[in-house]
A protein has these predicted regions:
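Cell wall/extracellular polymer interaction/catalysis modules
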Residues: 1-136, 143-162
Length: 162
């Protein structure tokens, strides 16, 4: 069962539809780092990252990773660590995963740019939102919808961004 982004603000899985937000500049086939677009394509869901100091009870079949204070996601296209989970390092550009604003209390890593091609986009996740504000390229859901989505995904679920 796949998750499909239909229209620009509806995520659908099975018979469930959830309002969501996407990149501020819409959907684009050839994503470029920093373009504020959500990448078009079909992507495997990888790991579920979560803040265990805030979230303890949830159902999910994906591999889970506890977010720690020193975790980041490298968004420096010139680094060999580009589009990878890293231990925060002052010499690298990164997206911090341990945040105060609750947007990353839960996030699902998708396999966009898994070959780590420089400038092809990094840190594309399904994560939380409070107000459906446009993202830098991710897909964002309200927490209650995210938790329902987690119950529905399987190890074979893909995300289709059309």
């Amino acid at each position: 069962m796949d998750i499909k982004l239909i229209k620009k603000n509806i995520l659908k899985i099975d018979e469930f539809q959830f309002k969501c937000s996407i990149g501020a500049k819409g959907i684009k086939k050839n994503k470029i780092e920093g373009d504020f677009c959500t990448p078009r394509g079909r992507y495997k869901l990888k790991n579920l990252f979560y803040r265990d100091d805030r979230e303890k009870k949830f159902n999910c079949v994906l591999n889970t990773v506890k977010i720690k204070k020193n975790m980041g996601w490298c968004d420096d296209p010139k680094s060999r660590h580009y589009n990878s989970l890293i231990k925060i390092n002052k010499n690298l550009k990164y997206e911090k995963l341990f945040r105060k604003d609750h947007l990353y209390d839960f996030l699902i890593e998708i396999d966009h740019n898994h070959k780590k091609k420089p400038f092809a986009g990094s840190a594309i996740f399904i994560h939380l939102t409070k107000n459906y504000k446009p993202t830098k390229g991710c897909i964002a859901l309200k927490k209650k919808d995210f938790l329902i989505l987690l119950k529905l995904v399987t190890k074979k679920t893909y995300l289709n961004i059309i």
